UniProtKB/Swiss-Prot annotation:
PROSITE patterns: KARI_C, KARI_N. Pathway: Amino-acid biosynthesis; L-isoleucine biosynthesis; L-isoleucine from 2-oxobutanoate: step 2/4; Amino-acid biosynthesis; L-valine biosynthesis; L-valine from pyruvate: step 2/4. Coiled coil: none annotated. Its EC number is 1.1.1.86. Belongs to the ketol-acid reductoisomerase family. The gene is ilvC. It comes from Salmonella agona (strain SL483). Mg(2+) 2 binds at D217, E389, E393. GO terms for cellular component: cytosol. This is Ketol-acid reductoisomerase (NADP(+)). Pfam families: KARI_C (PF01450), KARI_N (PF07991). Keywords: Amino-acid biosynthesis, Branched-chain amino acid biosynthesis, Magnesium, Metal-binding, NADP, Oxidoreductase, Repeat.
Amino acid sequence: MANYFNTLNLRQQLAQLGKCRFMGRDEFADGASYLQGKKVVIVGCGAQGLNQGLNMRDSGLDISYALRKEAIAEKRASWRKATENGFKVGTYEELIPQADLVVNLTPDKQHSDVVRSVQPLMKDGAALGYSHGFNIVEVGEQIRKDITVVMVAPKCPGTEVREEYKRGFGVPTLIAVHPENDPKGEGMAIAKAWAAATGGHRAGVLESSFVAEVKSDLMGEQTILCGMLQAGSLLCFDKLVAEGTDPAYAEKLIQFGWETITEALKQGGITLMMDRLSNPAKLRAYALSEQLKEIMAPLFQKHMDDIISGEFSSGMMADWANDDKKLLTWREETGKTAFETAPQFEGKIGEQEYFDKGVLMIAMVKAGVELAFETMVDSGIIEESAYYESLHELPLIANTIARKRLYEMNVVISDTAEYGNYLFSYACVPLLKPFIAELQPGDLGSAIPEGAVDNAQLRDVNDAIRSHAIEQVGKKLRGYMTDMKRIAVAG
């Protein structure tokens, strides 16, 4: 099989990379009705599989789970989760032939085996759904021409998909129809109904493409979302300890610092995050972020280039074929780092202390978010897609580090994201070491003293922060989500 993206001509590639339209609430007036009365069979019962299924069932859809025979016979975790939640569970042979929509929510590396197993069992004219398009775009999986292929991709972990639904809301979602597989022209109707059934229509839906979703998703998770947080955690911890900071305090400042800092990012973008600093600290954070962007730009561009060309995917799939040797080695090495093995700090760190003593961390967040966004947009990805795959998801990933450090982040994210994270962080750490060595007092671990600032300089920095394209599109999208939530709560 050939990488699907690489079979397209340049015009087709650009058209699919640039496909992104914010859909109006009125386009979901019919809710999930298009799928009501039809049989939806989910393959896989992990975080996305279970939580999407719960939402879809609560939206009135007929949901069951198809699992491998051995998973059922051995009563594995997937079987237990599905049965404990009252779902019908059966083998592929028992459930797939009756399905109107088969939703493949297994890990990326299992997609080819799953699709090759279910395709012969699917009835003529059925639909196949994904929540990530890697199998279609990067693997180049060939799907029978009578089958409609759609995607509904919530921009949050599965647990958040469920919690937001229970609150009467949802999470921002991308939907797409594979242009090679829409024989009856019903793909968009299926995708819209599926998105509505998960609650995504209440938070905002982008009509996208499989290509745009995959390329932007890979870029975001490799760089700012996971790779930058891992590299930043390791570098900042080692710097603090080398300068005499108690390892336990240093660990807590970093572990919970990312979450605290990005909560401001979530509420008001880079502007609010930077506004949490004193004026002297803001100017310093801005200067550091500009230096970081200059240093890291070639690395971000290399990751984007390798994602666009398929070089990243081919390398990762080679590691799949080699029993994940690289992935497992990197995972083990990460677990042995000083940050991961540091003792816990029992004292309290106040919220503002994370900002005051984390100027470098804030600069890293700003630089990473802006670089990821800029690099995606320069590659033809529309700004809204780039926003969701950079700034929007960052607080969610930071929250995983707050739970159990980098271990938790790498457990929660997909193996695809974890592999890309290691590629980036292993390159980024040595790249930034000379920069880290030149830091000044107050950049990390201690506060920058209050003092006079130049008004014109502060004005120009504030203007530069607020006028960045990601702040403009972010303000629009966050405002839309707030409006949608207000409407949803009002009923």
